[in-house]
Amino acid sequence: MASEIPEFGSAYAAEQLRRSRHPLRRLIKKFYLDHVLGEIEAGPTIDFGCGAGQLLSRLPAGSVGLEVNPHLVEALRCEGLDARLYDAYSDDFSLSQLEAGRYRSFTISHVLEHFDDTPAVMRKLWRACARLGVTTIVAIVPGAKGYASDATHRTFVTREWVRDNGLDYCEGYALERADYFPIDKASVGDWFVFHELHLVYRRKA
């Protein structure tokens, strides 16, 4: 049962919301969110796995957050955000509940590393984005130390991994940039837990 999985439960949601409201965490998170906001296109954005809504709350008007935890969805809706309960597996990652032609960008932050079948998931989501008319996709994954810090992580995504899995070009999108943040050097992630890899894809005609 989904309700028995911690990530779907009320305790997990409460902890995510508590952490998102901590003053120091908010200050640090703003630094990271500012960087993401500079990577997306102006206009409505789809935030896949929106969690506690830190990014969703700063996205352009008309943006939508998709989240598997119903308690987080309820909390975000109470804050006036367009958060929607979404079971990606039952929908085969097709984003079928979203209307084509409304969204410019798609973000997926600290989600891809949780899948065993990440290449297949990316191809399905990127294909869905193409159907919706999305022009920019930003995928964010942890560096080495961040990846190792969570036992639920299944796939370690690096620049080399993207290349080796044939994902430099994916479902009509070309990888424009693959940069590490806050320092663009992969080895920083060996000791700094908050190091990230940002993959920026653009739609090609």
Regions found by a protein language model. Give the residues of each.
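A short glycine-rich, Lys/Arg-flanked "PGG" loop and its adjoining helix->strand segment in the class I
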Residues: 120-134
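A structural helix-start
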Residues: 115-119
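Short, histidine-centered active-site or binding-site loop motifs used for metal coordination
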Residues: 16, 141-145
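Conserved beta-strand signature within the Rossmann-like core of class I S-adenosyl-L-methionine
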Residues: 132-142
